[in-house]
Every structure is written in structure tokens, then in C-alpha cells.
Amino acid sequence: MLKRTKGLLLLTLLVITGLAGTLKDSIISQKERKSAISLMKDTKADVIKSVKGLSDAQINFKQAPDRWSVKECVYHIAIAEKNLWDLLEGSMKASANPEKRSEIKLTDEQLIKIMEDRSNKVKTVSSFEPQNTPYKSLHEALNDFKERRTDHIKYLKSTTEDLRNHVVQMPFGSIDCYQLSLMIASHSNRHTQQLNEVKASPDFPKQ
């Protein structure tokens, strides 16, 4: 009887240890967490810095009728922050699909590089177009972006969710939800670059 009890206890300990290992393995590493948070913080600061002190004439200036103004770039950054994070949250509420990890072709570094490469032109979907956003001013859009990004950083600091085993299908291929958080941050970098290109135009108002 004692042998049997010891055997059951050992089996229980093995199961618990095994489960603990599984849970630990499914949580993003400290290195991954730090990388995502740093990217989120840095790109947030860049957006804020890029529009600081600009006049109405400057934020509304367009290099051409079919090009975005500084204000429109911020509208796009803000709505993308919301919509892409909504996608992440929806994916995390669904069942994990680790079997789809084999469909992921991009490393974290490759994804960031592609997103931040402005030579790779991509037409945005209609719901992300500045004129289709709910914002009425740059101030409103910027505040919405800042509040959401702050919440997203808090989430990444504390989450124990299995981001790597929730895979989502994007127009360019499959990525996991950790990569989606990197995509959100690098997307804002991409359009901060665009915004700075507008500011660098020879015709950009002096004030």
C-alpha cells in the first residue's frame, strides 16, 4: 500500500513538474519580452517626438494631392494600433493552434525589417485609410495612440499568455501573436518615417 502511495505521489509530482515545464515553455522568454517592450517604447517616443511643436499649416501640408499629410500619417498610425491589437486580442481568445507554426516563414528580425523598409510600398486597406478613421484632430489621434500603446506595453510586461502558439494569417503570410506585437510597433515606425519624409520636403512650411 505504501509502495502504491509513493508511486502515485511520484507520478503526481512528475505530472505537475511536466505541466509546469509546459506552461513555462509557452510563456515568452525574458529576452523576447524585453525586445518587444523596448520596440514598443522606442517607436511610441518617436511618434510623439516627430509631431511635437508643429503648426496647423505644417501638420496639414501635403507634398501632392494623393500623398498623406503629417496629420493623416498619425491618423493611420492610431487606427492601425487599435485594429491590429484588436486582431491580437481576438486571436488570443481563440484556441491555440500550434500546428500552424510550421506555416510561419519569417523570423522576428525579418518581420521587423520588412515592416520598417519604406522601399517596400504597400497599399493599405480601406478601414486604415486616414479619411475613414473616427479622428477629428491630430491631438485626438495622438492621444488615442498614446493611451493604447501604454496599455499594450503594460500587457507585454505582465502577460503569461501563450503568444507563440496563437498563429494568425496576414496578407503576407502567417505570424504568431508575439510577432504581431512586433509588427504593431514596427508599423508605427514605418509611418513615422513617412511622416518625417513629409517634414523633409523642400516645400514644407517653415512654421
Where are these regions (language model features)?
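Stable alpha-helical elements in mature extracytoplasmic
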Residues: 36, 43, 47, 69-70, ...
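Cleavable N-terminal signal peptides
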Residues: 8-11, 18-19
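Bacterial N-terminal signal peptides that target proteins for export
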Residues: 1-9
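Short, contiguous alpha-helical
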Residues: 61-110, 158-207
